[in-house]
Amino acid sequence: LITFPYASRIMMADGIGQVNFFQSIISYISLFTCLGIPMYAIREVAKVRDNPEKMTRITVEILLLHAFLTLLGYMAVAVICLTVTKVQTDIPLFLLLSATIFFTAIGCEWFYQGIEDFKYVAIRGMVVKTISVILLFLLVKSKEDILWYGAYSVLGVLGGNIFNFVRLRKYLHKDMIEFRALHPFSHLKPAIHIFAFNVIVSIYLQLNNVLLGFMKDAEAVGYFTAATKILVITICLLYTSPSPRDYAASR
């Protein structure tokens, strides 16, 4: 409600569309690098949260698996930069937005949800979003600041993941890890089972932007993004506002 009207006025439809088009492509790469790991990892961490040794081992194994998949993801980013003409129009922006893949890998949001440390997650999210909004108003002043807007798009959502990763030292114990006993790929098969559901959801949410970007241009994606946000905001307001029946019942 606050940032999008400002950003759309500065970036215009083609600037907003360019960022959203690239983000949609990267979201598919990120989908494959995550491979259902976040939802799977929440369950696995929750099962052993009272056992520091097992929790440390499982967390490190999942992080190693995610690191390997992230490496494959950046190989895909390199191939796209070399072969896709529409991405080659602004490779620096595409590479900047691809930082989403890295931040997702180190985010460990699943760990804090598994141990039910929701207070930290809420406070961290509020602080990071507040800082990112302030930086948006300070740094994005003209259409030429599209890289700053791209940085805001990444940091506003995933910047707090750096703090997540650093804070892991509070819970994980190096002396409990035997690296020879780690089996990161043992988590691959169960995570894939969740991956199929994530693919269906992602296709529904992101495919329109990708297809529109390839079939038309960034400006078309920008107008479509604005229309979608207006629709989502309207639906949210309708569902959160009290109905006449609820108002009558309360009286």
Label each region the model flagged:
Residues 239-251:
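Single conserved hydrophobic/aromatic residue that forms the stacking wall/gate
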Residues 27, 66, 94-97, 121, ...:
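Residue-level signature of transmembrane alpha-helical cores of multipass secondary-active transporters
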Residues 119, 146-153, 162-205, 220:
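Interhelical loop/hinge segments that connect adjacent transmembrane helices in multipass membrane
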Residues 4-29, 146-147, 186-190, 194, ...:
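Interfacial/gating helices of multi-pass transporter permease domains
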Residues 11-22, 48-60, 71-102, 142-149:
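Membrane-interface helix-capping segments at transmembrane helix termini in multi-pass transporters
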Residues 3, 20-49, 105-106, 198-206, ...:
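Small-residue-rich midsections of specific transmembrane alpha-helices
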Residues 91, 101-124:
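Membrane-interface junctions at transmembrane-helix termini in multi-pass inner-membrane proteins
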Residues 91, 98, 122-170, 190, ...:
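Hydrophobic alpha-helical transmembrane segments
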